[in-house]
């Protein structure tokens, strides 16, 4: 706006926290903006959806701001849902090498597949962003080497399998 304040206007379809049914159309299709749905909001996950789904959507928006691309951008709804549930987004720094490491960590924490690993409130998310802007240490921690390696293997299953077989052959010689 004219005071340089960001205004968030829409996350898609509103849903009452007391609602017992998912947001489903008359034809039985899940409704909403697919690219911003958290894993637990998609058809593939049948778990309780709470405010942490909004943290996910904010993480998607932050990722888009930093890379000018969506983290999950399949060709159709099924592919988008699959990517949201089972694939990791391309590492943010691969898409924009100028993004500081702490901001990458903040964004990836907001995009954790498991809601328990995400920021637990918008206040927590905002506080880490404020710490980043003040050059203070952030609360979010980067993924461990083990976590990064396991995510790499999941993203590159075929190549990882070939390397493992080659190493096994070399070890047996």
PLM regions and their residue ranges:
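Conserved protein kinase catalytic/activation segment
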Residues: 1-9
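C-terminal lobe helix-coil module of Hanks-type protein kinase domains
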Residues: 9-11, 33-154
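Flexible, glycine- and charge-enriched loops at secondary-structure boundaries
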Residues: 27
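Conserved, function-defining core regions and hallmark residues within catalytic/recognition domains
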Residues: 30
């Amino acid at each position: 706006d004219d005071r340089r304040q960001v205004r968030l206007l829409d996350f898609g379809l509103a849903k009452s926290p007391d609602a017992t049914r998912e947001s489903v159309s008359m034809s039985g299709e899940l409704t909403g903006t697919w690219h911003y749905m958290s894993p637990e909001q998609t058809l593939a996950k049948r778990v309780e959806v709470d405010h942490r789904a909004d943290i996910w959507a904010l993480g998607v928006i932050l990722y888009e701001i930093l890379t000018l691309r969506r983290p999950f951008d399949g060709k159709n709804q099924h592919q988008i849902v699959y990517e949201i549930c089972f694939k990791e987004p391309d590492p943010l720094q691969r898409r924009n090498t100028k993004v500081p490491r702490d901001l990458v960590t903040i964004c990836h924490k907001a995009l954790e597949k498991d809601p328990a690993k995400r920021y637990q409130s918008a206040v927590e998310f905002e506080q880490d962003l404020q710490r980043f802007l003040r050059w203070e240490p952030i609360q979010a921690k980067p993924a461990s080497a083990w976590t990064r390696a396991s995510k790499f293997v999941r993203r590159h299953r075929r190549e990882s399998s070939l390397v493992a077989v080659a190493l096994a052959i070399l070890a047996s010689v």
